[in-house]
Amino acid sequence: MCAIAGMIGAHLEERSLRKLLETMQPRGPDGSGVFQNKNVTLLHTRLAIIDPAGGQQPMILDWAGERYVLTYNGELYNTQELRHRLISRGHTFRTHSDTEVVLHAYAEYGTGCTELFNGIFAFGVWEVNARRLFLARDRIGRALQRHAEEILRHGGPGQIPVQDG
């Protein structure tokens, strides 16, 4: 399993980012990534199983005037089916990872994308232009997600849609 984390409301210095990534590293020894934009930070450490070269995260997609940033942990069992469905709707893919399928599905279907997913997952998507964070996990909660009180303090529950798959 990978490790994902995020924060809204503070800009983390390089030293703090390194320290946080070190604590996440045992769950994701194959690579790490950080997205930081003003007061939003998304972090990811990766256990590479599918498409080791192409699934680096956080993953960014520019689609229909919005920039989406995804940090994801999980496994979709219907990746190929969803990929074909999204291709038929005009999406193109650079990787073979289920991460990219999750990102494109969110861009196409919004929060309803989780209804299409068959698998175990937890993820966060930051919509840069809309300044909106969406958090989701699978129906059973096998892939756990945690978020700090910092999120609610700075955004308020009405600003951060949270959905249990």
Where are these regions (language model features)?
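N-terminus-centric sequence/structural signature that marks the extreme N-terminus
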Residues: 1-165
